[in-house]
């Protein structure tokens, strides 16, 4: 839902603005042209930001010094959140860095598009709503043992969207 709101807002503000053409440029010139275009688009979009607030389970976290990215999942989907120490404060950022995969967070901020093109939320306030008692497995490895998947069905439903979709469809049929 957040993605569709942002894309409609972006289309309204940027209109028919063409993508930057890098044909005939060397790698350095192309990179500079793409960065300049990104900065211009970001400046236009930052004039009227879309503020959002949402809650969900943290499924993935990348900490990079003073800033972090995390994926937050709820019933409707996943969205990436950008959390910087400058935006939320030193104490809140230190608490966030100690958090685990599976914790449930409430995030308030504004929507933006990263340089890689992914729609994200720049967090201005991060609240831990519920601490995960059991740390979830890593995103890339997940649960590989079949017996463990059946014994810890709740973890499999959280980690694998395909399993969750099958479960929901089966429940609707019955």
Which stretches of residues belong to each language-model region?
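Class II aminoacyl-tRNA synthetase catalytic cores and aaRS-like
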Residues: 1-174
